[in-house]
Amino acid sequence: MTASERELAEQLNRRLRHVVLMLRRVSADQPITSQQLSVLGSLEHGPRRMTELADEHGVRLPTMTAQINRLERDGLVTRGRDAADARVVTAGLTEAGRDRLAAGREQRIGFLAERFADLTKEERDAVAAALPALDKLLGAP
């Protein structure tokens, strides 16, 4: 790693931290935490194994189980069993969970869209041009 790569990594780290904290503040009035909203997002395309969710979110299985317990209690997720292995517990979104995810996502996107309105066209174009490199850097799908 070169000194310039390290400096760029430090600058990006600071900005990512700021973005995460800013979006958490925007979502502070939501009835669920930003972490719970993130878990709902992980279930958007269908039920997932609890172990997969824990791995994706970088937490231990008991921590994810506690998150799913709260979301299930609130009617946002349901538990099921894996069709291939009935011993495996899965979690999936309910309609209420989909609605909550959509509302949380819309709140964040609306906030960011307002912020983009403060930028010049050239600044917005620069952000848009950086997105493919950020996807590659962060391993985004």
Name each region found by the language model.
Residues 23-63, 69-70, 74, 90:
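N-terminal helix-turn-helix DNA-binding core of bacterial DNA-binding proteins
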